[in-house]
Design a protein with these regions (language model features):
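Short secondary-structure junctions
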Residues: 164-172
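A conserved amphipathic terminal alpha-helix motif
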Residues: 217-239
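Membrane-embedded alpha-helical segments of integral membrane proteins
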Residues: 8-59
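Membrane-interface segments at or immediately adjacent to transmembrane helices
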Residues: 88-163
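Internal/C-terminal transmembrane anchor helices
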Residues: 63-92
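Second-shell loop/turn segments in exported
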Residues: 142-149, 211-221
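Short beta-strand segments that buttress and anchor functional surface loops
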Residues: 180-185
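Beta-strand/loop substructures that line and gate deep hydrophobic ligand-binding cavities in soluble
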Residues: 188-217
Length: 239
């Protein structure tokens, strides 16, 4: 039993690595690598169960199967694959299945350049009432940022903060007060599109942000977290 456990765990690693690499290198759409990762996670999870059962059975029969050191190594190797998957499932259950978030649901910023760099198979950028309603309930604290700076000064701060966060700026329109950028997630390399809009308001400026994932049904809260982090960094830059 422990032999099968070790084989499954060893097989899981190349499956996951190749799946991640194929997507990051843009060799195929995200669905196939995602299924491959799920397969790797399943193999690792079964490996953990068989490993534990094998060790318990060996101890009960008084027969040595694997040394404790080797067993720990296999367990850690499998846990590294399984743990993120468990965390993802837990996070996914706690947030709505949406992937387009904005600080202004009444009048969301409209992408101008991003549609030209998206694939036809990517998520739509049309926001319907159902998505807006789910966002209001899930992220009631998401709001615009009011600055005392002029529109030109705010644009400099907005662009500098976006660059500091590692975003790739793909459009900067001083006259319209808009900046579009692309952010990439660490592990899978998913690309999310962001637009920052600056409008004059009450003697200063109002900054709104919209972040939308190109693929997937749920963003697992990533877009809302990105917007909050950006707004916090922007506010800190002003002080």
């Amino acid at each position: 039993m422990t032999l099968w456990a070790s084989r499954l765990i060893v097989c899981a690693w190349p499956i996951v690595i190749l799946a991640l690499a194929s997507f990051r290198l843009d060799l195929m759409s995200f669905k196939v690598p995602l299924l491959a990762v799920a397969l790797g996670v399943l193999l690792a999870a079964i490996g953990i169960v068989l490993l534990i059962l094998g060790l318990l059975l060996g101890a009960f029969k008084g027969q040595a199967t694997l040394s404790s050191g080797v067993a720990v190594i296999y367990f850690i190797a499998a846990f590294i694959i399984v743990a993120p998957a468990i965390q993802t499932i837990m996070v996914g259950a706690s947030v709505p299945p949406i992937h387009d978030i904005t600080t202004d649901p009444d009048d969301p910023p409209i992408f101008a350049h991003v549609p030209s760099i998206r694939k036809a198979s990517d998520n739509s950028l049309e926001l319907d009432a159902g998505v807006i309603d789910q966002q209001r309930k899930a992220y009631p604290d998401l709001a615009a940022l009011i600055l005392s700076q002029s529109k030109a000064e705010a644009m400099i701060l907005v662009a500098d903060t976006a660059t500091a966060m590692g975003w790739e700026i793909v459009r900067r329109d001083e006259e319209q007060g808009q900046l579009e950028a692309v952010a990439q997630t660490m592990i899978f390399g998913f690309k999310d599109d962001i637009i920052v809009r600056i409008r004059e308001a009450d003697g200063g400026t109002r900054v709104d942000v919209r972040s939308a994932s190109r693929v997937g049904v749920s963003d697992l809260g990533a877009n809302a977290a990105r917007i909050k982090a950006y707004m916090a960094a922007l506010q800190e830059a002003v002080q």
